[in-house]
Amino acid sequence: MFGQYEVFVQLLLLALIVLAGPAVILLLYLRGADM
């Protein structure tokens, strides 16, 4: 049970990184375009 929970947390962190990566790049691009 604890092992499944660890796997779920790792998948959640991986999903956050995959989603946050392009989001941060997009924010930096938009901020750079405004300037």
UniProtKB/Swiss-Prot annotation:
Assign the protein's first listed, main location to one coarse class: membrane
Which Gene Ontology CC terms are recorded?
photosystem II; plasma membrane-derived thylakoid membrane
| Record GO biological process | photosynthesis
| Keyword hit for Membrane | yes
Q: Which stretches are annotated as coiled coil?
A: none
Enumerate the subcellular locations listed in this protein's record, separating them with semicolons.
Answer: Cellular thylakoid membrane
Q: Which NCBIfam families match?
A: PRK13686.1 (NF010239)
Q: Which family does it belong to?
A: Belongs to the Psb30/Ycf12 family.
Role according to the record: A core subunit of photosystem II (PSII), probably helps stabilize the reaction center.
The molecule here is called Photosystem II reaction center protein Psb30
Provide the gene name from the record: psb30
